[in-house]
Amino acid sequence: MPVLQIRKIGDPVLRSKAKPVTEITKKTLSLIDNMVETMYQAEGVGLAAPQVGVSKRIIVVDTGEGQGLIELINPEIIETEGKDIMEEGCLSVPGQTGKVIRASKVTVKGLNRGGKEVRIRAEGFLARAFQHEIDHLNGILFIDKVVRIGEEMI
């Protein structure tokens, strides 16, 4: 599986809303496999298709917290709960981090690689990773959400 080039801030694909996957083909599955390989090679915890130059609604996540690899097609957040602030970084924004307020718990709905709908209830770091990657599908980068001094009261 080839490792894909990770697009960096300034690339227009990172600021575009990704298109839904309408059919899961061999090409789709190959893209997912290559995204997984790229994420692990880059030592990331998540990757969205736009980060490798593909404007499709696909994410892969593995926070290393024991839940294993999660691959989602057309993911969407359907429920949120609570708020939390935490430092974030991004493979597409190298060398920069910042504190971001996000929901502490989320329920995410999407399709697995077999086309079956799945719902995942996540909290903590996994919930944050889902929100970060789904933001990528909407052309949003974490730096757009970094809190400024005085905004940290949640």
From Swiss-Prot:
Gene3D superfamilies: Peptide deformylase (3.90.45.10). Keywords: Hydrolase, Iron, Metal-binding, Protein biosynthesis. Fe cation binds at C90, H132, H136. InterPro entries: Peptide_deformylase (IPR023635), Peptide_deformylase_sf (IPR036821). Its EC number is 3.5.1.88. CDD domains: Pep_deformylase (cd00487). The active site is at E133. Pfam families: Pep_deformylase. It is an enzyme of class 3 (hydrolase). It catalyses: N-terminal N-formyl-L-methionyl-[peptide] + H2O = N-terminal L-methionyl-[peptide] + formate. One of its GO terms (biological process) is translation. Binds 1 Fe(2+) ion. Its cofactor is Fe(2+). GO terms for molecular function: metal ion binding; peptide deformylase activity. Removes the formyl group from the N-terminal Met of newly synthesized proteins. Requires at least a dipeptide for an efficient rate of reaction. N-terminal L-methionine is a prerequisite for activity but the enzyme has broad specificity at other positions. Belongs to the polypeptide deformylase family. This is Peptide deformylase. It comes from Halothermothrix orenii (strain H 168 / OCM 544 / DSM 9562).
